[in-house]
Amino acid sequence: MSGTILENLSGRKLSILVASLLLCQVFCFLLGGLYAPLPAGHVTVLGSLCREDHTRQNDTSFLLYSRGAGACIPVSREEVERDPMKMANELVHVFQMPLPRDLRDLDYSRWQQNLIGVLQVEFGYDSTSELREPPKELQLTIDMRLAYRNKGDPDQAWKLYAHGVEQRYLDCVTAHVGPTETLYSCDMIPLFELGALHHSFYLLNLRFPLDTPRQMNLQFGHMHDLTLTAIHQNGGFTQIWLMLKTVLFPFVVGIMIWFWRRVHLLQRSPALLEYMLIYLGGALTFLNLPLEYLSLVVEMPYMLLLSDIRQGIFYAMLLSFWLVFAGEHMLIQDAPNKSTIRSRYWKHLSAVVVGCISLFVFDICERGVQLRNPFYSIWTTPLGAKVAMTFIILAGVSAAIYFLFLCYMIWKVFRNIGDKRTSLPSMSQARRLHYEGLIYRFKFLMLATLLCAALTVAGFIMGQMAEGQWQWNDNVEIQLTSAFLTGVYGMWNIYIFALLILYAPSHKQWPTMHHSDETTQSNENIVASAASEEIEFSHLPSDSNPSEISSLTSFTRKVAFD
């Protein structure tokens, strides 16, 4: 049996490999911590009030903007207060993005990738009104028009991007009680989400139509201040992220080709663990593929959904691999047949598949619909918000349970190894050194796997919470740092890169010896190893089944013949 490179690589070469990979890991953390800005930035825009012509209320091509040639004449709050009807059905709340800085107009860059808008509403009632505490889950109907223009276009050349009349539900509290009016402040509500930030400038017009027969927006007194928070990915972070993907992609592809060629040179069919490794490498390659470069040229509103699908495939493959990886090293070979997914792991992997499919369906229900209507959100209704929050909580709990189960499996592996080590003293010294070295290397690799799993689960839970942080009632702010994101992403690549190297078949072949000559040869190996700093484990003969990927898995069948 030739074994794997993990078994046959000398101690010095293995130390050099591990040190090099650790340096790469440190570099990934430093790259995000020292050079990349925060992953996301935001700008807060206070809405401007404009008054529109009655004759053009239903004209969706008519757009009001607050800056540039032909801008609307702003309406002051005093003018609204003096009007007996508070200018009902005449006011348009205008948000123009991005805001200028230092008297200079700024524009969005395609490197910023996406744009999310959330709105905070304040409305007021006359203090003479009987309403003091507004009821919960107030239904607000909003006429939303989103437009864009590009750099170099005239100021008035706004083009309609999307239009919709949507309902949002508000939970409000009393903000201020004055002698003439009472103000109420409401929780933030999701407004729109763009999967591609392809244009330079964006304009949002909001109308709150009043309709007595349909009881539309009659429970509100009058809108006071509207604040839009526009969240975008930072362009500097995108550049660092894509640079990392561009560098890692060819390395992973190259090591996969090298690994699979070595497997096919053997006189056997690939083992289950080798299949899982190549599948895992394929999922990582799909994740590493820097498709985001295309969004710099072509508008791709489906990029967010595609990114979620790619990451979901990788998560499913990585979680499945860890279960198989731990299971294949249980050192329990009761069945004479080769391990298969269906025979040994279908129960474990079914839970992973069901969980990933559930998250995929949840993602399609929101971001899939947003391809047609960017104003849609599953958070808009009380029931939808509860379902979404339940999904996020269940996803976090499931990830934690998975990690605990993986810890249990690895603990069983370590316990089995400890039980089998009792047979080492009865072996020859050379064979005992052989297996002690393998056990030490294997334990180190399993601990690295556990650390990788812990960071992956932590990143997944934090990512799920960050997506829904605008819905938490306690104003919890969760910011994934660039160092954490680039570090975990680099860790995935380095970990899988190392597995593909260490579990590749070793092609060192040694002549098979009879048992009567083995003790003499073992003693010669011991003398030789004493004069050297490293032990080449591959010098030892083995009577293992040639279909096994590692001699460690056949440890239980070894017989001491000293």
Swiss-Prot record:
An example Gene Ontology molecular-function term: Wnt-protein binding
Major localization class: membrane
Keyword Zinc tagged: no
UniProt superkingdom: Eukaryota
Protein name listed in UniProt: Protein wntless
Residues carrying covalently attached carbohydrate according to the record: 58
Keywords associated with the record: Cell membrane, Cell projection, Developmental protein, Endoplasmic reticulum, Endosome, Glycoprotein, Golgi apparatus, Membrane, Postsynaptic cell membrane, Segmentation polarity protein, Synapse, Transmembrane, Transmembrane helix, Wnt signaling pathway
Organismal lineage: Eukaryota, Metazoa, Ecdysozoa, Arthropoda, Hexapoda
Start and end residues of each stretch annotated as Disordered: 539-562
InterPro entries (alphabetical): WLS-like_TM (IPR047843), WLS_GOLD (IPR053936), Wntless (IPR009551)
Keyword Glycoprotein: yes
Function: A segment polarity gene required for wingless (wg)-dependent patterning processes, acting in both wg-sending cells and wg-target cells. In non-neuronal cells wls directs wg secretion. The wls traffic loop encompasses the Golgi, the cell surface, an endocytic compartment and a retrograde route leading back to the Golgi, and involves clathrin-mediated endocytosis and the retromer complex (a conserved protein complex consisting of Vps35 and Vps26). In neuronal cells (the larval motorneuron NMJ), the wg signal moves across the synapse via the release of wls-containing exosome-like vesicles.
Short name of one Pfam family: WLS-like_TM
